[in-house]
A protein has these predicted regions:
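Fe-S-dependent hydro-lyases/dehydratases of central metabolism
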Residues: 1-960
Length: 960
């Protein structure tokens, strides 16, 4: 069907002899004048809807709905958004590739053309999640860490190489080039695309990582989705989402001397969390926004998940052009981009009154002060001068008040650490909580990969003689994460601070684990060119690798004797890192206090050695002459930083660096041998296995949904289900599907051992996401998760770990792993349900949290609220998400886990309709409760009825 708005297809000029066609928003505005008042981010979405209007997936009504967007309307309509491309990281990319391979296998079994299973948009997988800080502090650390990385992940990398040759549009940026979001910003982002027929359109994307929003800093619409939704997007399906509110964020003034982009983003995060922007677009405007360079904008966009927004968007302007020039895009590309944005009348940052927003938040940049965030949440900003005092206060506060529940008199106690390597008692995976610690139902956030990876290196003993450690001591100091290492201003500041510190004779104690793990090779190039890298190395910040590393918990272990001292004395030690998340135990299981800081402050705290020192009123340390050295003595000025910026904005350097992705990917990557063929042969492997989602797959989908019938309602109902878990608030996707270490006594550990894998080769759950046998056994296996079905102890404590009570048909119960109970219920033909509190599924965009739930036979999750991506993923796997109404909760209903549950949704499965839950208790009584069905859009109804998004998409592809 021809586009109903074909008259909007216009031509624009981009210089002599260069022109392009485009679907013109100014032309559309003649029909819908409201378009001229739309936020810039929504205009990019509108262009996609307009261009892809085919009368089937996207209709003229969809175009009209977006064009007539009202800032304060109720949000009930969905937008079908076709993205230009998809980006992946390796922990989420490998299972996604396994699903694509399984689709081809299913097509082959049906005698269909496997070539129909092909990404219809460019897909780039950047390998960044697998390298760990095993070695650090020395110049050969990166080489040693990469060799270990390749040894641990050989099978995964072989599978990626198969994908590269099997799919025409699937590319891989090999290990050692950087972090997906920084590589996206510096290399993959184009600003605009052009089809073979000459039609140009905005760059846009989704990524299978929550911090995909970093790309918003260059005016590209994009956000994080689960792997399931990402697969649908790459196979040509629109990304469906409810029409959003767009919150305008007006920045005024300018940053004061000594403040950094990190200080700014921590202030923005704190402010927007208070304004509750979950599920909304945030768009920055105003004079202050115009003044920000793209790296500063990208830092703010990166942390959109931390302030809860779907995006933190910055429109394209002269600063964007400067950045594209400085990072090696060609002059022709940049001219074409600018001409296109001007033709769309979208070049430039809006000023107050130019655009209509749902609400406006304001911040004067001059009010921003040097800050850290922590010690447990990124939104808990602390002014630099208050860090020490805040730590002292929290030290003795109850855990429920964000404290550490310690006795105040032990705060300053020091503990001896022997320097010689001893055989230390292993730190338990499930350490008992102190009896005095209060218990509460808010689960901790711990999205971290493993410390106990295969082929782990033995950590060397503490150097430099016996030491003492105590509460507040900094034991990990990491310049890490794309959030900050993408920003030359703060990286040069760190190098300059290190230079001044070394020149004054300051040093870092050798027992502090220091590391530098930037998001691209260009960072070390410009630090080297500016002659600053040697000073960082002298303070222990030697290059450890290019990847996420400490930011995602790949910090490696501490020395055995330090671990033992922390564990035996229950010390509250600290990590200071330039990352974006600091949830408890994320960075290291024995480090309880984690602070986010700018790279120069990371270096400063490494020198100070403790967060109990007030760096505003106390010296950082003593110099070589024995004199006190203050932070002001070594803090670089903005003039000093700006003089070195030429080294960072080096177009030739960026082109040379990223030119090696294909030309010189490295000997380690070239040494990986991938298999050939259009379909994968699924050799026996504990890393990669054909997922079961297409077993018994047929081309026949569900029958058309009748207008209303009891039979239809009955078919979708959950009957006589058992409760498998009762959870509290803030259950994260890491609780549901951990990325970290695999216990040998867990169901996954048992399975690996049964298949010949020794404990030292377990690697992590994150690295084994290509094998459903491991992952389904690892679902709800986080050692810190608390199933409140289990009875409380005499002191009120709750047992931790993936356990439940299995109820047999005679009414008897038995404690066992959730996986084992789930398999028993499946064998009996009984479904199961989960009950939870607020923010169920918060944290990382982890599709296995939904896949594992489905494979355990769980039919529904009933919660007080859901995180956006996980709710979508549950629907995408055919699991019903349902929400309590009003103040209702499972606690208010008095559920214990002994009950059986019926859930009957609306007969038509209308989005956000009412469902009826019937609770049957052991005493024969029953109770009816109204729930809200959290299938939010019509397309999600189709996904659910097909058994999930993957069967739906495969039927679409093979029926075409």
């Amino acid at each position: 069907m021809p586009n109903a708005f074909a008259n909007t297809l216009q031509t624009f000029q981009a210089g002599p002899g260069r022109s392009g066609q485009f679907y013109s928003l100014p032309e559309l505005a003649k029909l819908y004048p409201n378009v001229r008042r739309l936020p810039m981010s929504l205009r990019i979405v509108l262009e996609s809807v307009l261009r892809n209007c085919d009368g089937r997936k996207i209709t003229a009504e969809h175009v009209e709905q977006v064009a007539n967007w009202s800032p304060t309307a109720s949000r009930t309509t969905e937008i079908p958004f076709v993205v230009a491309r998809v980006v992946l990281q390796d922990f989420t990319g490998v299972p996604l590739l396994a699903d694509l391979a399984a689709m081809r296998s299913a097509a082959q079994r049906l005698g269909k053309d496997v070539g129909r299973i092909e990404p219809l948009v460019p897909v780039d997988l950047v390998v960044d999640h697998s390298i760990m800080v095993d070695h650090y502090g020395k110049t050969d650390a990166i080489d040693l860490n990469m060799k270990l990385e390749f040894r641990r992940n050989k099978e995964r990398y072989q599978f990626m190489k198969w994908g590269m040759q099997a799919f025409d549009t699937f590319g891989v940026v090999p290990p050692g080039f950087g972090i997906v979001h920084q590589v996206n910003l510096e290399y993959l982002a184009r600003g605009i695309h052009q089809r073979a027929d000459g039609v140009c359109y905005f760059d846009s994307l989704v990524g299978t990582d929550s911090h995909t929003t970093m790309i918003n800093g260059v005016g590209v619409v994009g956000w994080g989705v689960g792997g399931i939704e990402g697969e649908a997007a790459m196979l040509g399906q629109p990304v469906y989402f409810l029409t959003p509110d767009v919150v305008g964020f007006e920045l005024t003034g300018k940053l004061r001397e000594g403040c950094t982009a990190t200080d700014l983003v921590l202030s923005v995060t704190e402010l927007l969390r208070k304004h509750k922007v979950v599920g909304k677009f945030v768009e920055f405007f105003g004079e202050g926004t115009r003044s920000l360079a793209v790296p500063d904008r990208a830092t703010i966009g990166n942390m959109a998940p931390e302030y809860g927004a779907t995006m933190g968007f910055f429109p394209v302007d002269e600063r964007t052009i400067d950045y594209f020039e400085g990072t090696g895009r060609t002059r022709d590309q940049i001219k074409f981009l600018e001409a296109y944005f001007r033709a769309q009348q979208m070049f430039g940052v809006p000023m107050p009154g130019d655009v209509d927003y749902s609400a406006v938040v304001k911040l004067d940049l001059g009010d921003v002060t040097p800050s850290l965030s922590g010690p447990k949440r990124p939104q808990d900003r602390i002014e630099l001068g208050k860090v020490a005092g805040t730590f002292r206060t929290l030290f003795s506060k109850p855990i429920a008040e964000n404290g550490f529940n310690q006795q105040p008199e032990v705060l300053l106690t020091r503990h001896q650490v022997e320097s010689e390597l001893q055989t230390a008692a292993p730190v338990p995976d499930n350490p008992p909580t102190r009896l005095a610690a209060p218990r509460y139902e808010v689960e901790m956030e711990a999205n971290k990969p493993t410390l106990r990876a295969s082929h782990a290196t033995s950590v060397p003993p503490v150097e430099g003689g016996d030491i003492t450690i105590g509460n507040g001591d900094v034991l990990i100091a990491a310049i890490t994460s794309c959030t900050n290492t993408s920003n030359p201003g703060v990286m040069l500041a760190a190098g300059l601070l290190a230079k001044k510190a070394v020149e004054k004779g300051l040093r870092v104690q050798p027992h502090i684990k220091t590391s530098l793990s930037p998001g691209s090779r260009m960072v070390t190039e410009y630090l080297r060119d500016a002659k600053l890298l040697p000073y960082l190395e002298q303070l222990g910040f030697a290059l450890a690798g290019y990847g996420c590393m400490t930011c995602i918990g790949n910090s490696g272990d501490l020395t055995p004797e330090i671990n033992e001292a922390i564990s035996q004395s229950d010390l509250v030690c600290a990590a200071v890192l330039s990352g974006n998340r600091n949830f408890e135990a994320r960075i290291h299981p024995n480090i309880k206090a984690n602070f986010l800081a700018s790279p120069p402050l990371v270096v400063a705290y490494a020198i100070a050695g403790t967060v109990l020192k007030d760096l505003m009123t106390e010296p950082v340390g003593k110099g070589k002459d024995g004199k006190d050295v203050w932070l002001g003595d070594i803090w670089p000025s903005s003039d000093e930083i700006n003089k070195l910026m030429k080294h960072a904005m080096n177009p030739k350097g960026y082109r040379n660096s990223y030119g090696k992705v294909k030309a010189e990917p490295g000997a380690l990557w070239q040494g990986i041998e991938g298999v050939a063929g259009d379909t994968y042969s699924w050799p026996t492997s504990t890393y990669i296995a054909e997922p079961p989602f297409f077993e018994g797959f047929t081309l026949e989908g569900p029958p058309p949904l009748p207008a209303a019938s009891a039979a239809a309602a009955s078919k979708e109902a959950v009957r006589d289900a058992r409760i498998i878990a009762l959870f509290g608030d803030s259950i994260t996707t890491d609780h549901i599907s951990p990325a970290g270490s695999i216990k040998d006594t867990s169901p996954a550990g048992r399975w690996l051992q049964e298949h010949g894998v020794v404990k030292t080769d377990f690697n992590s759950y994150g690295s084994r996401r290509g094998n459903h046998e491991v992952m389904m056994r690892g679902t709800f296996a986080n050692v810190r998760i608390r199933n409140l079905m289990l009875p409380a102890g005499p002191d009120g404590s709750r047992e931790e770990g993936g356990l439940t009570l299995y109820w047999d048909r005679q009414g008897g119960s038995q404690k066992m792993f959730i996986y084992d109970a789930a398999m028993k219920y499946i064998s009996e033909g009984r479904g199961t349900v989960i009950f939870a509190g607020e923010e169920y599924g918060t944290g990382s965009s982890r599709d296995w949290a939904a896949k594992g739930t489905q494979l355990l036979g769980i039919k529904a999750v009933v919660a007080r609220s859901f995180e956006r991506i996980h709710r979508s993923n549950l629907v995408g796997m055919g699991v019903l998400p349902l929400q309590f109404q009003g103040d209702m909760s499972w606690q208010a209903l008095g559920l214990t886990g002994e009950e059986t549950i019926d859930i009957v949704p609306d007969a038509q499965l209308r989005p956000q309709s009412q469902a009826e839950m019937v609770i049957r208790r052991p005493d024969g009584t029953r109770q009816e409760v109204k729930l809200t069905l959290r299938i939010d859009t019509p397309i999600e109804v189709d996904y659910y009825r097909h058994g999930g998004i993957l069967p739906y998409v495969l039927r679409q592809l093979l029926a075409g």
